[in-house]
């Protein structure tokens, strides 16, 4: 139950507050021919248009919250928010028209007294856009220097200093009178926590406006509500009267208190012999204020209390909100005796204003007078109010200093109570934490629609720019015509909406330029097409959405599905302006196909704009998603362990063999343990250097990390030993024998030994070894030498090993490569088919067909190699075996047999056309007088020897070198001579036969009675003897074969011959022979 005096004092306080709320803003002190010297970086000045007198300027300042000073300068009005006293200090100047008028506002006085500077900072700027830019102020006020103040001015030293001391800077000692006067402007906080603000209007709205003033940048409604809720805790607040005062305190509102000013109530103690007065703050807001404003501090009523009274009717006060680490105030009270308490002058320091990210502060209390020499004061700090989301740290040690950290945005009120022997005092301090300074973002101009198409008879259009955005406020819109039929300025209106009418056919382009409250601008354009005839717009089709996964970072977007009723004349690709901006490479941006490369992880949006022959356009969007590939953890490789020989004191730590699927971004070397400290260089690189090594074993750890944060570690050991080195012993592996077709081998030199370890291996091919044969990789620098493609012959390799001290040793390895025992049986079959087109199934079919042709089993045909011969032919090397045990058939016989069998087949028996069948190797002996060409498979004979042409072309056709050139030449010469002789004889015989005519043989008849004259020898004409006359001794009558000649011989004596003939005939009949005389010739 509350006592009647307490109820009466509460009613009086409410009446005083209600009376003060109705008082209006009034004019304060005025200075003529004076200016101020502000710092333009920490003051807010706004120029007001359409003011005609000093009174109008002062009225404008009264109407604007947080305006402290009305400045009339050369016919222009400027409203000033001082923020700090030195910013509004008047200075005299020359005879110019300049008047400074400070305004007075009715406020209620709070017990949490703040000095002027902190109150100005706490007020901030008014809600909305407040203050002109520095460039505009310097143009309007050219006399301001670089620091924002006048270049040469004098100060109003007396009256403004008196104003500052008496009015602007309240003293820590409270005015003992019932009220205080504030002639120029009120500097103390009102009951709702604001400073120098009008008490009229809705308290909730005023609270929101004040919170905006405390914020360096405009807040939206949600942020304001959050800040209001966090400014004052909804829990019951600490009452400034929560402690039992050691003297009687009575609430006595004065006339000034009834006019709206809340005063400090002080009353002398009747039994206090010292005569000092104890300040008693009054914190009683009106009930309406408590109910309507969420930021209003809850305070208890003030009661008349008898010191140390234990009457059950005496009211008790609510405890203050004390956070962990703070001690609730407790007062040493004696229940039986009454003592005189000495009042201490306690100051908690100036009110603080912090701006995030600075959230730390230190409060320090000072007391006057100082404690006696042998005693000390007791300090108790308590948190009176704090934001709801307060989670800061308070370091309380019952000392004069209080440490604060991790403070959030809002207002904090602290109270410190200092007590000593028969002495007590308390002080208050406010800490205001403001949000971080706002960074202005330029506005974004948005027009809707961007492209608008109309067809006659429609000639009116509307373009909406109200969707433009800004982080603060857009203050102006400006439209202008960029292209198209001229409209004139009458059609353009500087408003968010552009209304157009009576438009002529054509293409129009309008630009919208917007300006925000900070002067930043942005512009965009809108296109308007007025068509005279009906033409349907094109339909853009950018294709379906695409998704790719890294490492693939290229793709082609296809827009050729776009259509139009006439013709599309232009394709345009560009990233969607509303999407995220990522780096990429675009090619073919004005073609139907957009080539994209160097894409990164994320989502891309592209817009395709197509334009038809009449200029109509259409757009379509396509989304491309680039997904990250699965990331694997890196693999750290610190390298092999090292052994060093003292006095070597440094080593290289090589981690460059560490790997990751996306690349390693971070290396870090650490010295884990060892016999002594070492110095390391480049510990964040792949290769580090360590120095200062001593004899012993050191352990180092390498940690690698990839782009996604995955890491891996590896450990390296470095052993430093004393010098005692023996040369190494090389072992190359001895002699090895290979038999073709096996043409690969590994020579193992790892059995080489050294007392400290071999650091390098080097394999060297002997100069007399065949040049053919390949070394795989860089194995010639390793312990094992890997060889392949060896040919028939003997290879010699020398192994050279070296230890860490440079000592070396060598050894030799021999590799003998023997010919293939199946070499004589390998057949080469060339088919007209590309090697890439021959399948395994087709190969098996070919094997079966060859087995049929050769009359063997499928398993007897062994395919050794299949390789390309040309781009359109393939070589198959195989051999044929038969019998048990298996015996390889001669390649020449197999090839000859295949030739015969294939030549008998009418059609193509094999799957593919056969281009050639031959032995794989050149197997001809060449009769021991030449060698076989491995390419042409023919004998190349030695000098003086040649091929047996008969065998080559008439018999088996095998190339050979059987004939000697000498024998062939002699035989050819002999044949030539014989042929010539026979030919000459034949010619001669033919000529003689043509000159000689053969006579008929003469028939002779033996005559019995022939005289001596008649027995003369008959000779042929021209003296040629007849053979019959040489052998016949008797005369015979003959009929000459040359009757014609006889007729010719005896033609002259025809008559005589006729007589003779008659006689002869008669004689013949009678057996008498004829005679032949020479004279008859």
From Swiss-Prot:
Gene3D superfamilies on file: Immunoglobulins
InterPro entries (UniProt xref): Ig-like_fold, KIAA0319-like, KIAA0319-like_C, MANSC_dom, MANSC_N, PKD/Chitinase_dom, PKD_dom_sf
Gene Ontology BP, a term: thalamus development
Extracellular side: 23-964
Cellular component, GO, one term: cytoplasmic vesicle
Cytoplasmic side: 986-1081
UniProt keyword annotations, A-Z: Cell membrane, Developmental protein, Endosome, Glycoprotein, Membrane, Neurogenesis, Repeat, Signal, Transmembrane, Transmembrane helix
Motif (Endocytosis signal): 1004-1007
Compartment list: Cell membrane; Early endosome membrane
Topology class, membrane: Single-pass type I membrane protein
MANSC domain sequence ranges: 23-99
Composition-biased stretches (Polar residues): 197-209, 228-253, 283-298
Tissue expression per record: Highly expressed during development in ventricular zone, intermediate zone, cortical plate, striatum, hippocampus, and brain stem.
Transmembrane segments: 965-985
Known function: Involved in neuronal migration during development of the cerebral neocortex. May function in a cell autonomous and a non-cell autonomous manner and play a role in appropriate adhesion between migrating neurons and radial glial fibers. May also regulate growth and differentiation of dendrites.
Subunit structure and binding partners: Homodimer. Interacts with AP2M1; required for clathrin-mediated endocytosis.
Protein known as: Dyslexia-associated protein KIAA0319 homolog
Organism of provenance: Rattus norvegicus
């Amino acid at each position: 139950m509350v006592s009647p005096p307490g109820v009466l004092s509460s009613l009086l306080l409410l009446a005083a507050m209600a009376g003060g709320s109705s008082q209006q803003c009034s004019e304060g002190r005025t200075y003529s021919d004076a200016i101020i010297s502000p710092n333009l970086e920490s003051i807010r000045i706004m120029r007001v248009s359409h003011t005609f007198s000093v009174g109008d300027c002062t009225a404008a300042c009264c109407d604007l919250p947080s305006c402290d000073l009305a400045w009339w300068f050369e016919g222009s009005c400027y409203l000033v928010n001082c923020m700090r006293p030195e910013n509004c200090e008047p200075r005299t100047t020359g005879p110019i028209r300049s008047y400074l008028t400070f305004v007075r506002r009715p406020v209620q006085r709070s017990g949490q007294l703040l000095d002027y500077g902190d109150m100005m900072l706490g007020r901030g700027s008014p809600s909305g856009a407040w203050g002109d830019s520095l460039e505009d102020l310097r143009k309007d006020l050219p006399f301001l220097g670089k620091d924002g103040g006048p270049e040469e001015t004098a100060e109003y030293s007396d009256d403004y200093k008196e104003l500052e001391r008496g009015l602007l800077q309240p003293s820590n000692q409270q005015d003992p009178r019932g009220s205080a006067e504030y002639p120029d402007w009120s500097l103390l906080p009102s009951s709702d926590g604001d400073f120098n603000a009008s008490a009229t209007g809705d308290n909730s709205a005023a609270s929101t406006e004040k919170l905006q003033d405390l914020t360096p940048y405009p807040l939206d409604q949600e942020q304001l509500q959050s800040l209001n809720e966090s400014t004052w805790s909804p829990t019951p607040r600490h009452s400034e009267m929560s402690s039992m005062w050691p003297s009687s305190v009575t609430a006595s509102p004065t006339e000034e208190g009834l006019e709206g000013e809340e005063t400090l109530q002080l009353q002398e103690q009747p039994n206090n012999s010292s005569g000092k007065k104890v300040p008693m703050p009054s914190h009683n807001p009106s009930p309406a204020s408590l109910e309507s404003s969420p930021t209003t501090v809850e305070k208890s009523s003030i009661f008349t209390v008898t010191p140390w009274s234990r009457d059950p009717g005496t009211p008790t006060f609510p405890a203050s909100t004390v956070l962990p680490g703070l001690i609730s105030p407790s007062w040493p009270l004696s229940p039986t005796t009454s003592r005189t308490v000495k009042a201490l002058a306690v100051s908690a320091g100036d009110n603080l204003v912090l701006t995030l990210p600075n959230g730390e502060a230190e409060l320090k209390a000072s007391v006057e007078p100082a404690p006696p020499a042998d005693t000390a004061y007791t300090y108790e700090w308590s948190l009176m109010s704090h934001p709801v989301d307060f989670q800061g740290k308070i370091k309380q040690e019952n000392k004069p200093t209080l440490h604060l950290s991790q403070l959030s945005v809002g207002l904090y009120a602290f109270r410190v109570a200092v007590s000593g022997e028969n002495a007590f005092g308390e002080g208050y301090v406010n800490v205001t934490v403001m949000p971080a300074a706002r960074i202005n973002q330029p506005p974004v101009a948005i027009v809707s629609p961007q492209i608008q198409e109309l067809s006659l008879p429609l000639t009116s259009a509307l373009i909406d720019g109200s969707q433009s955005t800004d982080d603060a406020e857009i203050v102006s819109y400006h439209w202008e015509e960029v292209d198209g039929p001229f409209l004139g300025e009458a059609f353009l209106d500087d408003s968010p909406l552009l209304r157009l009418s009576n438009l002529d056919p054509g293409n129009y382009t309008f630009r919208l330029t917007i300006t925000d409250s900070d002067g930043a601008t942005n512009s965009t354009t809108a296109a308007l097409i007025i068509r005279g005839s009906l033409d349907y717009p094109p339909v853009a089709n950018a294709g379906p959405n695409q998704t790719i996964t890294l490492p693939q970072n290229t793709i082609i977007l296809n827009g050729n599905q776009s259509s139009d009723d006439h013709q599309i004349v232009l394709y345009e690709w560009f990233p969607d302006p509303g999407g995220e901006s990522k780096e990429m490479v675009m090619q073919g941006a004005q073609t139907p196909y957009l080539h994209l490369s160097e894409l990164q992880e994320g989502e891309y949006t592209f817009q395709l704009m197509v334009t038809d022959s009449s200029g109509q356009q259409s757009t379509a969007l396509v989304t491309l998603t680039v997904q990250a590939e699965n990331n694997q953890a890196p693999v750290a490789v610190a390298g092999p362990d090292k052994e060093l020989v003292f006095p070597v004191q440094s080593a290289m730590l090589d981690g460059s063999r560490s790997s990751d699927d996306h690349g390693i971004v971070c290396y870090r070397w650490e010295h884990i343990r060892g016999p002594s400290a070492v110095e390391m260089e480049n510990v964040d690189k792949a290769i580090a250097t360590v120095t200062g090594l001593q004899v012993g074993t050191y352990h180092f750890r390498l940690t690698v990390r990839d782009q996604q944060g995955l890491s891996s570690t590896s450990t390296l050991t470095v052993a430093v030993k004393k010098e005692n080195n023996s040369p190494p012993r090389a072992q190359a592996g001895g002699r090895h024998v290979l038999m073709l077709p096996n043409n690969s081998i590994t020579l193992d030199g790892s059995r080489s030994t050294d007392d400290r370890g071999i650091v390098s291996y080097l394999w060297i091919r002997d100069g007399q070894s065949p040049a053919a044969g390949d070394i795989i990789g860089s194995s010639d620098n390793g312990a094992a030498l890997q060889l392949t493609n060896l040919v028939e012959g003997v290879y010699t390799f020398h192994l050279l090993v070296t230890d860490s001290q440079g000592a070396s040793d060598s050894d030799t390895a021999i590799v003998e490569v023997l010919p293939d025992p199946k070499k004589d049986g390998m057949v080469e079959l060339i088919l007209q088919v590309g090697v890439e087109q021959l399948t395994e199934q087709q190969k098996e079919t070919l094997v079966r067909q060859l087995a049929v042709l050769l009359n063997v089993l499928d398993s007897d045909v062994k395919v050794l190699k299949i390789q390309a011969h040309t781009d359109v032919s393939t070589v198959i090397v195989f051999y044929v075996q038969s019998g048990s045990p298996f015996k390889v058939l001669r390649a020449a016989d197999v090839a000859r047999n295949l030739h015969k069998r294939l030549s008998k087949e009418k059609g193509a028996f094999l799957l593919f056309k056969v281009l050639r069948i031959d032995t794989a190797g050149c197997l001809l002996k060449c009769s021991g007088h030449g060698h076989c060409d491995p390419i042409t498979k023919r004998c190349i004979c030695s000098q003086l020897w040649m091929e047996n042409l008969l065998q080559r072309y008439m018999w088996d056709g095998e190339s050979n070198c059987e004939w000697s050139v000498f024998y062939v030449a002699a035989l050819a010469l002999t044949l030539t001579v014989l042929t010539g002789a026979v030919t000459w004889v034949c010619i001669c015989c033919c000529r003689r036969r043509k000159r000689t005519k053969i006579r008929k043989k003469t028939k002779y008849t033996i005559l019995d009675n022939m005289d001596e004259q008649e027995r003369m020898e008959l000779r042929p004409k021209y003296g040629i003897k007849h053979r019959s006359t040489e052998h016949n001794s008797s005369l015979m009558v003959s009929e000459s074969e040359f009757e014609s000649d006889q007729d010719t011989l005896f033609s002259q004596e025809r008559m005589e011959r006729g007589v003779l003939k008659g006689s002869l005939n008669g004689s013949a009949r009678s057996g008498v022979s004829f005679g032949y005389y020479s004279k008859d010739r």
